[in-house]
């Protein structure tokens, strides 16, 4: 009976602590921040695709708790010039924002996404233009995958400001570029979905958006090739506890770095890191007053050469200077166009241009997998060839096909496209043998 008595006392003590609030975690805080939808409204999108995407954005925003001083939403169109359908703070409910999204018209014109991103940074996300300081900022870019101007540099500037970037592509575009443009990890922030299946990701994406806008959210800013700044809202005080901050390279779990910080700390700079590397960060609040869950984040440093430096406790120490990656040589230009042909229920042909010789390229990797999820497959194509036939496909299925050129310098360049196999032929009905006519003998074959 003694073990059961001890167990009962332990449970009673735990319940009493929970009722007193000593072990109770903080209540679920309402999301607060600025959410921008960047919608491809150019002529590269068909009217049908635009209507489906518009309905998708409306479904995303309808249940959101919009309101003054809380969560605000904005919609910007991508075209020859960016166009603001409605700015932050115009709508005080998700239903009103949904009605405005549904009433929006396609702008047509060129796909100047980079220009729209610069506009978003200067006119909407900048504090000088009325943006709220200290609140989470999220960008949801819905695109058909292509852009007439560079997207990488202006998108990186937004992420350096602390903007969390989600990307939804309807199946075309450069997979590597979109992965780099989205916030890390890409598997959480980048979605390739057929335009008729966008409803499948509504609930998951909305939940991810709300998680990114919680006040307790740990986030990274000032990301360079050799470091980044971590920031978080005040969760503790100097008297109520302390933080343990852990940094682990994703590919080297044994190379962890740890730092203990006082309870009144709200940021920290990690420096002296490797370029173009994923790091898993954990912020663990330790307190005897209340139980707080650890916060986990993955951050990818920018490409370039690592610079000297070490992390320091000074909030204003500043990150290491930004190292810009060298631009690829002209002869290292990757695939610029993909053509899908000879589509059969279980195969299709993929061609691309330009074709690169063995002097510049080692060859091509062609990766393909179902858009709705499934195992991806890979085919190797030697340099000098610019086509291959994909076999063993499923009838009536949409695939994402990515052609990656591997250069001798170690660089890679990729382009993605959506391909669909037709439905297979219906099986022919087997002939029913006819009964012999009365009075006649059946013939042997």
From Swiss-Prot:
Localisation: Secreted, Extracellular space, Extracellular matrix, Basement membrane
Signal peptide: 1-22
Pfam (any one): VWA
Domain annotation VWFA: ranges: 34-213
SMART domains hit by this protein: FN3, VWA
GO CC annotation, single: extracellular exosome
Modification Phosphoserine, positions: 74, 80, 93
GO biological process: behavioral response to pain; extracellular matrix organization; protein homooligomerization
Gene3D superfamilies listed in its UniProt record: Immunoglobulins, von Willebrand factor, type A domain
CDD domains: FN3 (cd00063)
GO molecular function, one term: protein homodimerization activity
Domain Fibronectin type-III: start-end pairs: 214-304, 334-427
Annotated segments matching region Disordered: 302-325, 411-445
Positions glycosylated per UniProt: 264
Modified residues (Phosphotyrosine): 83
Modification after translation, per record: N-glycosylated.
Compositionally biased region (Low complexity): 311-325
Keywords from the named record: Basement membrane, Disease variant, Disulfide bond, Extracellular matrix, Glycoprotein, Neuropathy, Phosphoprotein, Repeat, Secreted, Signal
Physiological role: Promotes matrix assembly. Involved in the organization of skeletal muscles and in the formation of neuromuscular junctions.
Disease: Neuronopathy, hereditary motor, autosomal recessive 7: An autosomal recessive, neuromyopathic disorder that manifests in childhood or adulthood with proximal and distal muscle weakness predominantly of the lower limbs. Affected individuals have difficulty climbing stairs and problems standing on the heels. Most patients have foot deformities, and some may have leg muscle atrophy. Muscle biopsy and electrophysiologic studies are consistent with both a myopathic process and an axonal motor neuropathy.
Complex formation: Homodimer or homomultimer; disulfide-linked. Interacts with HSPG2.
Protein name: von Willebrand factor A domain-containing protein 1
Organism from which the protein derives: Homo sapiens (Human)
Gene that produces this protein: VWA1
């Amino acid at each position: 009976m003694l073990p059961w008595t001890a167990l009962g006392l332990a449970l009673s003590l735990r319940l009493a602590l929970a009722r007193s609030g000593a072990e109770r975690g903080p209540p679920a805080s309402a999301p607060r921040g600025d959410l921008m939808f960047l919608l491809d409204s150019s002529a590269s999108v068909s009217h049908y695709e635009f209507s489906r995407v518009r309905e998708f954005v409306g479904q995303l925003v309808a249940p959101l708790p919009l309101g003054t001083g809380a969560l605000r939403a904005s919609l910007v169109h991508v075209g020859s010039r960016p166009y603001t359908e409605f700015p932050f703070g115009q709508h005080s409910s998700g239903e009103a924002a949904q009605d405005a999204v549904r009433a929006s018209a396609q702008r047509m014109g060129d796909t100047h996404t980079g220009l729209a991103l610069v506009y978003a940074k200067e006119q909407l996300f900048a504090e000088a233009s009325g943006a709220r300081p200290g609140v989470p900022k999220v960008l949801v870019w819905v695109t058909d995958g292509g852009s007439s101007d560079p997207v990488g540099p202006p998108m990186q500037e937004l992420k350096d400001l602390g903007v969390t970037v989600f990307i939804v592509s309807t199946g075309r575009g450069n997979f590597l570029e979109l992965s780099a443009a989205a916030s890390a990890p890409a598997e959480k922030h980048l979605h390739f979905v057929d335009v008729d299946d966008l409803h499948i990701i509504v609930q998951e994406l909305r939940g991810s958006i709300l998680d990114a806008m919680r006040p307790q959210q740990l986030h990274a800013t000032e990301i360079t090739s050799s470091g980044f700044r971590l920031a978080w809202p005040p969760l503790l005080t100097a008297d109520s506890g302390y933080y343990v901050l852990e940094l682990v390279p994703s590919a080297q779990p044994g190379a962890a770095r740890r730092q203990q910080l006082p309870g009144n700390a709200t940021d920290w700079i990690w420096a002296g890191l490797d370029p173009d590397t994923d790091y898993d960060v954990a912020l663990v609040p330790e307190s005897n007053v209340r139980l707080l869950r650890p916060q986990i984040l993955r951050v990818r440093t920018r490409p370039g050469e690592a610079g000297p430096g070490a992390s320091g406790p000074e909030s204003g120490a500043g990150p290491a200077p930004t190292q810009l990656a060298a631009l690829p040589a002209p002869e290292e230009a990757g695939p610029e166009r993909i053509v899908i042909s000879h589509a059969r229920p279980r195969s299709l042909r993929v061609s691309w241009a330009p074709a690169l010789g063995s002097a510049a390229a080692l060859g091509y990797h062609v990766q393909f997998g179902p858009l709705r999820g499934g195992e991806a497959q890979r085919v190797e194509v030697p340099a000098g060839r610019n086509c291959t036939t994909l076999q063993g496909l499923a009838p009536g299925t949409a695939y994402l096909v990515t052609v990656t050129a591997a250069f001798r310098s170690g660089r890679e360049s990729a382009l993605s496209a959506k391909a669909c196999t037709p439905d297979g032929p219906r099986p022919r009905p087997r002939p029913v043998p006819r009964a012999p006519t009365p009075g006649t003998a059946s013939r042997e074959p």
